[in-house]
Amino acid sequence: MICINCCCHVESLYVAYPGDHIRLTDCWQCGEVVDRYVEFDNVLLFIDLLLLKPGAYRHLVYNSLEVDMRRYPEHGTRESGFRGYVQDWLLWFRKYDRLNRIWLLLITFEVYLMWMTEEKKYNNYYREPATQYGWHLLTGDVLSLQNPLLQYLFFAVYVIGDLALLHKLTRESLLNWSQWGQDLRYAKDIVSYTILLSYGAKIFPILMLIWPYDSLVSTSIIKWIANFYIVESLRIVTSKSYSYIILLFAGIFIVRSVVLKPVLALIVSRGNMLQAQRYLWGEYELFKFRFLTKRDIFL
């Protein structure tokens, strides 16, 4: 646990007295209350998260998370074999039950939003040049499928793969390359929780189902804002410089773009290398077309 003001380590957040009374602990270094969000309502905490208040993020990813993690053993069972394997998995599901449910909700919304956005982008912007120049586009062939379930599965794989790469690369970069969090007990969980909290901004376009307007432009703006949320939240939690976080995020974006599309092309083409190459060439030509014509490049 840490002081949300100066980030120094502390032993406790408050002292409990009879009658459910508590006294918040003062920080030995800065003299401020260690974590004033202990007494905050969840609604006020959520508002401060939206406003990117550093204290709100530090309260959740450091203090609140550690309190939850301490309820469970840090390591799995010592039993070997299939029984021990099953018990470890059950412990993992209990330990991360709340976080997993939030992830499932976010992914479900993100899949639907991507499906809706990609369909509109293809019909409004990509179909005409693809037909004119004979490009084979992943999105076009997937949206032409008659089975909606297959379309949904494609975008589900897209979202989950994209999120998995973001999550894995961010953790590896911070924990192994920059050696951040060496003195933290739950460093991996802290990074994961930070990504979860900031990633939630990506589902705000779901409100456009209630109040329709120029959805493509608005969705793109919100996605750029969500990317800013991720950068800012990682800076708050890790205390790294903006230049480091932006460089890290740019590198991860490039890796995600290079890795994910070829994998999806192989899946859609069912392992047909020639067809997969056509998809990748079509995506490359589309990117060049958008860049050279400066058409919907930020959508």
From Swiss-Prot:
Q: How does it sit in the membrane?
A: Multi-pass membrane protein
GO cellular component entries: cortical endoplasmic reticulum; endoplasmic reticulum membrane; Golgi apparatus; Golgi membrane
Chief subcellular location equals: endoplasmic reticulum
Its transmembrane ranges are 99-116, 149-169, 190-210, 211-231, 245-265
Q: Where in the cell is it found?
A: Endoplasmic reticulum membrane; Golgi apparatus membrane
One short Pfam name that applies is Arv1
- GO BP terms in the entry: intracellular sterol transport; regulation of plasma membrane sterol distribution; sphingolipid metabolic process; sterol metabolic process
| Keywords for this protein | Endoplasmic reticulum, Glycoprotein, Golgi apparatus, Lipid metabolism, Lipid transport, Membrane, Sphingolipid metabolism, Transmembrane, Transmembrane helix, Transport
InterPro entries listed in its UniProt record: Arv1
Which sites carry carbohydrate?
176
Reported function: Mediator of sterol homeostasis involved in sterol uptake, trafficking and distribution into membranes. Also regulates the sphingolipid metabolism.
Family indicated by similarity: Belongs to the ARV1 family.
Q: Write down what this protein is called.
A: Protein ARV1
